[in-house]
Amino acid sequence: MIEAGIIGGAGYTAGELIRILLHHPEVNLNFVYSTSQLGKSLYSIHQDLIGDTEIEFTSKINKEADVVFLCLGHGNSKRFLSENKFSEKTKIVDLSTDFRMKANDHSFVYGMPELNQEEIKNANFIANPGCFATAITFAVLPLAKNGLLNDDVHVNAVTGATGAGTSLSATTHFTWRDNNFSAYKSFEHQHLQEIGQSFKQLQSDHTSEINFIPNRGNFSRGIHATAYTKFSGELEDAKKLYSEFYKDAAFTFLTDEELHLKQVVNTNKCLLRLQKFGNKLLITSVIDNLLKGASGQAVQNMNLMFGLEEKMGLNLKAGYF
């Protein structure tokens, strides 16, 4: 069994990670570290876990664990790893932004299996992608692979309230979020950098703009993204490119039907739909921001790192009705 630990166990992504790992056939959840919830049962915070586990939040860290997931606030993972040294055998999966951009001062691999599967299999350190970055990158990556990303990409995406985390703020409060809709961080969202990095990895001469408008939706979870760019070929040409690129992808699927968040919420899937309007290709992408956009993808990466079947523990059912 893989001995797993979680650092920072009280948030939404940690909660989803706990749920997956508790039912993963090859994993034993060894510890969940949280100083703010020390001594409390996991189900006192993640209340749906009552009856599933008696594990308590702890301040003790097993530095010999096989894999450790970091569910810390952005900017805290670097400091945590500098203060805590793990065994050489321990694999690290970081769910923050801290290591997503390539740099000479770290050896983290960007953990997008559809892009870097072989590197992930051989990695000891994984930087898990962001939720918006996952939905948007999947929508456009096949174009970059074929050197066709030569014009500006325009993206409009809506995320559920869980994308903002558990900390309260004026824009996450129920009375403001309910029956409301708003844009934020237009053209300057932090995920733009990693999206551009992925495009450039496959199309080195990529210099066109990514015009991204993120929106807050009045629902709990999920991301619905629409992206469009110029495409000179026919719709069938685009479908062939996308089908070829994702033919071996464990969780990414193409459809000709209208997409709905309910098809993917509570799953690790990404669904894509292609449409052609004049000289523009429109790609719709839907994911669960907490699963394919965070914890599910993290476990998918873990499976690859340990040589397990990629979908193990992740055959999850959508809450369709």
Swiss-Prot record:
It catalyses: N-acetyl-L-glutamate 5-semialdehyde + phosphate + NADP(+) = N-acetyl-L-glutamyl 5-phosphate + NADPH + H(+). It comes from the Bacteria. GO terms for molecular function: N-acetyl-gamma-glutamyl-phosphate reductase activity; NAD binding; NADP+ binding. InterPro entries: AGPR_AS, AGPR_type-1, NAD(P)-bd_dom_sf, NAGSA_dehydrogenase, Semialdehyde_DH_NAD-bd. The active site is at 131. GO terms for biological process: L-arginine biosynthetic process. It is found in: Cytoplasm. Keywords: Amino-acid biosynthesis, Arginine biosynthesis, Cytoplasm, NADP, Oxidoreductase. Its main location: cytoplasm. GO terms for cellular component: cytoplasm. Its EC number is 1.2.1.38. Pathway: Amino-acid biosynthesis; L-arginine biosynthesis; N(2)-acetyl-L-ornithine from L-glutamate: step 3/4. SMART domains: Semialdhyde_dh (SM00859). Pfam families: Semialdhyde_dh (PF01118), Semialdhyde_dhC_1 (PF22698). Belongs to the NAGSA dehydrogenase family. Type 1 subfamily. Catalyzes the NADPH-dependent reduction of N-acetyl-5-glutamyl phosphate to yield N-acetyl-L-glutamate 5-semialdehyde. This is N-acetyl-gamma-glutamyl-phosphate reductase. It comes from Christiangramia forsetii (strain DSM 17595 / CGMCC 1.15422 / KT0803). The lineage of its organism: Bacteria, Pseudomonadati, Bacteroidota, Flavobacteriia, Flavobacteriales.
